[in-house]
């Protein structure tokens, strides 16, 4: 018995010594965890946005924000592992102590007396305390404390780090945090049952004894990996395709609507930055804002879905940042940078020429797709090469902004102010440009196919006075009611475009291609159309007084009811052109009505943005002054009558017109601008010039329904084909006795 007692006392001493050391370690672990909870809890969305260093409490040390969220969980995990390791060693000693105690003292009363000599450390008392104390309140509280500090708190802290950092959107850090959470769960499964039961790590009891523990572990794993995701993350994209309900659950917890009053998200957490109504310009910078190149750098940041409505970010640098789905409504973004920079990758921005020496890598450009910048203040901002597809810029203030080579396909710029802006080579296909103010803007070589300018009607027309649209791609664009006085559209591609009731007084459309376009009742007084391609265009009721038609191609065009007084230059081709008999040569203003002319002229000039454009337009429309004599190059009524006489009539007209329409709408692949044939075909249906084929209209319709034999048929929509069938039916009714 003495030998057993001596051995027990040695084990008891070892247990107490170990308990004292583990207690110190445990307290240090709790303090460290609490320290991290406070540090992480102090991180705000503003700090994440500005990458503000984290100031550690007490130590007064600043740590880099990203570095902190990478290193802190790892250090904590190592500390956690070491603490579990020491607890397991203590647990093994306690198991040995219990076995030795039972052998040395068979009597329960003696064992109870010996147990009172153990260290009061909560964990020791739970594993080796007196039996009478174990069911008591003290024991229950001790178990709660140990479970919270060694199971709940560590997992909570690691999850807190992940959730707090999630809006920053850095996949490698988030995945590192997920791995650390999984590692913590593995450590728990390896050590905690062994610690609780005093076994080896490999001798864990069956899973059925830990159902709640297992369920909670699965829940934590599922939450960390599948629920706590952020917009644009690769995993989230996969889940959206294969398991949409998981994404819905994630949105419910992390992506709720934002309270416009408090500026806080309504969801429990947030996976995007929410910083409404905040200023990001330091007071010292505010005083010298004009002298600064930039106020804050956000280059290359992932800011997808960020809510920055009404934020003050003047002169901020977003070069190469990802702002897809972000909200910057009414934000102050004057002179902000949303452009491109080289990243060393070879891929270039779509739309850039391969021959250019300076290629902007697509991954080095700012992405602002499907974002909202409604009513944002963007005067002088730069969006060169930016990806703005589907973005809302309605009512945005973009005066003097640069959007050269910007990708704006499907974007909405309704009521936007773009006076003096540069949109050279911008991609604006199918964009909504209702009531946009483009006065003095430059849209050279801009791509505007099927863009919509006329949705605002005559009350809210798009304004292009004095704008430069040279070489612009405006095929199929809807420009009805647009104000284009003094605009330059040299070599512009306007096949199938709708310019009905458009104001083009004094505009320059030299060598523009308007085949199949609709210019019904357009105001073209004094416009220059030298070498313009107007084959198959409809200019019914157009005001062409004083227009310059030198070498203009008007084959198959309609000038029915058009006003042709003092038209100048001689059109090159007038075959199949529809002309009134007699020609409408009514003066715009009668002689001795110079006061009316001057008032009309002054109203036009007042809409132009600069003196240069005013001088140019004034010179072009001065030919309409009733007090001036006819110009020397006037196209007289006799000239128009001669052209009408040369045009075939009756059956010959229908046959030749049919061949002309088919050739125009079904340009061969080798023909110039054959890629624009679908726009021409659409335009001929829309402006109804196609009905000039008369009884041969079904033949034309048959051609337009054969994409293999007619390139123009490729782009025809279901609505176009329905309209074509309607025209054929209409023609059949006319010819049926």
Model-found features: residue ranges?
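Intrinsic low-complexity/IDR segments
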Residues: 2-54, 63, 68-70, 75-737
């Amino acid at each position: 018995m003495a030998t057993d007692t001596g051995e027990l006392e040695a084990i008891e001493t070892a247990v107490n010594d170990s308990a004292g050391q583990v207690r110190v370690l445990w307290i240090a672990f709790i303090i460290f965890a609490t320290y991290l909870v406070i540090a992480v809890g102090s991180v705000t969305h503003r700090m994440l946005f500005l990458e503000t260093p984290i100031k550690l409490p007490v130590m007064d040390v600043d740590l880099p924000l990203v570095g902190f969220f990478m290193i802190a969980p790892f250090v904590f995990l190592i500390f956690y592992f070491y603490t579990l390791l020491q607890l397991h060693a203590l647990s093994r000693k306690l198991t040995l102590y219990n076995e030795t105690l039972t052998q040395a003292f068979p009597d329960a009363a003696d064992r109870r007396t010996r147990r009172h000599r153990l260290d009061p450390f909560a964990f020791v008392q739970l594993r080796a305390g007196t039996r009478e104390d174990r069911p008591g309140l003290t024991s229950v509280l001790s178990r709660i404390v140990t479970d919270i500090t060694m199971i709940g708190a560590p997992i909570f802290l690691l999850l807190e780090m992940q959730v707090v950092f999630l809006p920053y959107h850095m996949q490698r850090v988030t995945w590192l945090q997920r791995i650390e959470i999984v590692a913590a769960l593995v450590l728990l499964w390896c050590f905690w049952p062994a610690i609780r039961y005093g076994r080896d790590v490999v001798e864990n009891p069956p899973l059925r004894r830990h159902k709640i523990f297992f369920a909670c572990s699965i829940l934590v794993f599922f939450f960390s990996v599948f629920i706590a995701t952020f917009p644009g993350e690769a995993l989230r994209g996969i889940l959206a395709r294969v398991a949409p309900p998981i994404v819905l659950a994630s949105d419910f917890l992390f992506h709720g609507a934002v309270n416009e009053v408090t500026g806080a998200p309504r969801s429990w957490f947030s996976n995007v930055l929410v910083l409404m109504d905040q200023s990001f310009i330091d007071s010292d910078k505010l005083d010298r804002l004009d002298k600064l190149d930039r106020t804050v750098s956000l280059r290359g940041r992932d800011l997808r879905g960020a809510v920055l409505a009404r934020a003050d970010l003047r002169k901020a640098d977003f070069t190469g940042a990802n702002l897809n789905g972000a909200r910057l409504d009414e934000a102050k973004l004057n002179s902000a940078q949303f452009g491109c920079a080289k990243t060393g990758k070879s891929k270039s921005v779509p739309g850039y020429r391969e021959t250019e020496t300076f290629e902007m890598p697509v991954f080095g450009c700012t992405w602002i797709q499907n974002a909202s910048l409604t009513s944002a203040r963007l005067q002088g901002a730069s969006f060169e090469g930016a990806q703005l597809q589907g973005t809302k810029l309605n009512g945005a203030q973009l005066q003097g902004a640069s959007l050269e080579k910007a990708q704006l396909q499907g974007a909405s710029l309704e009521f936007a102010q773009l006076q003096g802006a540069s949109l050279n080579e911008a991609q604006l296909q199918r964009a909504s440009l209702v009531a946009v103010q483009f006065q003095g803007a430059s849209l050279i070589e801009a791509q505007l196919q099927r863009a919509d300018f006329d949705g605002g009607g005559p009350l809210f027309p798009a304004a292009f006075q004095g704008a430069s649209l040279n070489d612009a791609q405006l095929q199929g664009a809807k420009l009805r009611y647009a104000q284009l006085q003094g605009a330059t559209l040299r070599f512009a591609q306007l096949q199938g475009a709708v310019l009905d009731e458009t104001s083009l007084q004094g505009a320059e459309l030299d060598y523009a291609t308007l085949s199949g376009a609709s210019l019904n009742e357009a105001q073209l007084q004094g416009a220059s159309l030298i070498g313009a391609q107007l084959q198959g265009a409809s200019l019914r009721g157009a005001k062409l007084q004083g227009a310059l038609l030198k070498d203009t191609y008007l084959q198959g065009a309609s000038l029915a009811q058009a006003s042709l007084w003092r038209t100048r230059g001689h059109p090159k081709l007038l075959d199949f052109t529809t002309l009134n008999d007699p020609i409408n040569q009514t003066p715009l203003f009668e002689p001795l009505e110079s006061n009316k002319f001057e008032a009309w002229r002054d109203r036009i000039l007042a809409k132009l943005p600069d003196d240069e454009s005013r001088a140019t337009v004034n010179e072009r429309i001065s030919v309409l002054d009733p007090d001036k004599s006819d110009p020397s190059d006037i196209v007289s009524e006799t000239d128009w009558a001669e052209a009408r006489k040369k045009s075939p009539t009756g059956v010959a007209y229908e046959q030749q017109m049919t061949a002309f329409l088919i050739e125009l709408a079904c340009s061969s692949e080798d023909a110039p601008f054959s890629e624009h044939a679908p726009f021409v075909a659409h335009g001929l249906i829309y402006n109804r010039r196609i009905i000039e084929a008369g009884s041969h209209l079904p033949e034309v319709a048959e051609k337009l329904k054969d994409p293999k034999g007619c390139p123009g048929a490729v782009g025809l929509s279901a609505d176009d084909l329905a309209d074509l069938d309607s025209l054929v039916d209409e023609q059949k009714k006319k010819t049926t006795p």
